[in-house]
Amino acid sequence: MGIFDWKHWLIILIVVVLVFGTKRLKTLGSDIGEAIKGFRKAVNTEEGENRPAEPQTGTSAGDTLNKTQTIEGQAQKVDTPVRKD
């Protein structure tokens, strides 16, 4: 179960409806929905404006990311000190 059972949530819902009223809750819900919609629209327009133009050269961004480097040498084992508590 958890901290709150379904009965607890029902009591909390009834108290909230009694305190604020259904009209105020409906208005609050629509205001929150409009705010979320506006936020998503703003994020989408910012992404479109900040997106750089595609490079016109023959190489793509993926070519530069996939280049690998080989490191020459040998691995050495390092002894870690033992803690004495």
From Swiss-Prot:
Keywords annotated in UniProt: Cell inner membrane, Cell membrane, Membrane, Protein transport, Translocation, Transmembrane, Transmembrane helix, Transport
Membrane topology: Single-pass membrane protein
Bias (Polar residues): 56-73
Signal sequence bounds: none
Gene Ontology cellular-component annotations: TAT protein transport complex
Organism superkingdom: Bacteria
Region (Disordered): 43-85
Short name of one Pfam family: TatA_B_E
Gene Ontology biological-process annotations: protein transport by the Tat complex
Location(s) in or outside the cell: Cell inner membrane
Transmembrane segments: 1-21
Record GO terms (molecular function): protein transmembrane transporter activity
Subunit comment: The Tat system comprises two distinct complexes: a TatABC complex, containing multiple copies of TatA, TatB and TatC subunits, and a separate TatA complex, containing only TatA subunits. Substrates initially bind to the TatABC complex, which probably triggers association of the separate TatA complex to form the active translocon.
Function: Part of the twin-arginine translocation (Tat) system that transports large folded proteins containing a characteristic twin-arginine motif in their signal peptide across membranes. TatA could form the protein-conducting channel of the Tat system.
Family indicated by similarity: Belongs to the TatA/E family.
Name used for this protein in its record: Sec-independent protein translocase protein TatA
Species: Azotobacter vinelandii (strain DJ / ATCC BAA-1303)
Gene that specifies this protein: tatA
